[in-house]
């Protein structure tokens, strides 16, 4: 028992510190880190604590069609690492057309979302020097999806993006 008590104290103390660190991280990022989302991960180059978690959460939320939470997660990652190009890519991706916002059965983007997505895409490109080669490929592929013109047809952009994604998926089968 004399040996067990100090061990339990150390284990308890360490677990409390980890919990406090997580709470501090959440407060600093301004968004929750949610549990139970699965284990999908896309390894990014940022080494800033918490950015990988928020990026993964943003991507999972985008894949789950919860774009508002996806955007919030990517913004939290950006807040922690303002030089994370792929984090701005993620927000631009989540701002794009999706099945939750339609008109006459077609996915649409609001004029503001079109401007915001284009702006985030340009921010990712401006930070591309901080990106890994794989991240650069993803960023440059998404560039074909947006043009900043709220009045232009999305059809050629969607076709160009689909073609660029086909080439990207051939390069990265994972």
Question: Across the structure, where does each feature detected by a protein language model lie?
Answer:
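Sec-dependent signal peptide recognition
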Residues: 1-7
